């Protein structure tokens, strides 16, 4: 399980691309694909092997708090849970 201080990176054989047929982003890997919603794509766009989970949540919080509706703690919890789910599938690694 990832924590706020984990520095996630995509597995080297995984990549995010836009699927023209499905009209949405997908996380592709040799054994399959994960369809992404806008939130998942926004999170994975920030996964670069440099930012911590906390950094990613902070950037998203700044983006979404422009509307004043996003709780930073809730965003951190959601980002951590989402990336931990992908880490359990070995699509995300902790540096």
Where are these regions (language model features)?
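Long, charge-rich, low-complexity alpha-helical segments
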Residues: 33-95
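Acidic, low-complexity/disordered tracts enriched in E/D and polar residues
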Residues: 1-45
């Amino acid at each position: 399980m990832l924590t706020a201080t984990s520095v996630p990176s995509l597995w080297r054989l995984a990549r995010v691309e836009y699927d023209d047929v499905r009209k949405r982003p997908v996380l592709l890997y040799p054994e399959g694909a994960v369809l992404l919603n806008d939130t998942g794509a926004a999170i994975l766009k920030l996964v670069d092997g440099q930012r911590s989970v906390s950094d990613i949540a902070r950037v998203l919080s700044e983006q979404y708090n422009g509307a004043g509706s996003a709780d930073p703690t809730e965003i951190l919890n959601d980002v951590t849970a989402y990336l931990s789910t992908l880490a359990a599938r070995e699509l995300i690694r902790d540096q």
